[in-house]
Amino acid sequence: MCVLCVCWAAAAAMAAGPVPVEEMNPSYVYVGPVGDGGWTYMQDAGRVKVDADFPGLKSTIVESVPEGPAVVPVLEKLIRQNKSKLIFACTFGYMDFVLDVAQKYPDVTFMHVSGYKRADNVGTMFGRMYQPRYLSGLVAGSMSKSGNIGYVAAHPIPEVIRMINAFALGVRKVNPAATVKVVWLFSWLDPGKEKEAAKALIDSGCDVLAMHADTGAVAQACEEAKVYVVGYNNDMSQYAPTMHLTAPIWNWEKLFAPVVQQVADGTWKSEAVWAGMKEGAVDLAPFGSAVPEEVRKRVEDDRAKIVSGEWDVFTGPIKDQKGEVRVKEGTTMSDPDIWSMNWFVEGISGEIPQ
């Protein structure tokens, strides 16, 4: 299997020697339930595919582990009782606690999803989700008649901010006068709050909604109100069969499988893995029936440029909310700058809480 990674940080160190697949006992720690229909659902779908691809591999999952110190005893138990030699910690808020536990168990390999801190036996992984986010913005901008587009967002962290920015860049590429209105949830998974935020955006005049949350609640609200919606994580057309336009989606097996192979081979090293559409780690869900052929063609044309490496989303000129140029024409943001993004692009209505 190929190693699907783009690394801007130097490798810290090689892990321990080869670990036979039969003895690896990989564990996956999830922030939500497998049945959330989104983030955790897709991560577990990836796990299942990886298990099927490696004969003898038997994985363990722990669901609904809150971000914060609650993850520590879970990790300890997986190492001591489950004898896990590889652990995937699958949400941003586990970061510092994974590092603390990893210090005590140097012979265990940890991969932290969405984080940026590494150690000799701790790597990080994520996908270039901003790429399909931009493409979904092209769709949303094309389908909005009012130019008022809502975005239900989880937490004000760089992961979410760069997604909103990429989406807004896509929206305004085809609808230059459009505005993307952001509402913060301060939660990854809260169906009630997600639906409430969606209804508030619809009531404010938004005729297309996008989302960065873990369930299908926003899509359900849009279906009920007959407002177009762009999903996230998974193809969410099941929640909005007539109003779902498309969704940026994850193929987590493309991230998990290379790590399993490397640990088995004894070639794993601590690094930042960031795979994109080219590697198949992220993509765009099928278009809904409402999306016209000319919009589909525009999206496919830009998709081809991204996959080929001819062009990427954060290529200038790009201005921020204040109208100041942040990315000059002819230049593209570096990976570290994209990863640490803490400002909104022009055309976004809303603030980033400090």
Predicted regions mapped to residue ranges:
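A residue-level marker of the well-folded mature domains of exported/periplasmic proteins
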Residues: 16-354
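Bacterial N-terminal signal peptides
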Residues: 1-12
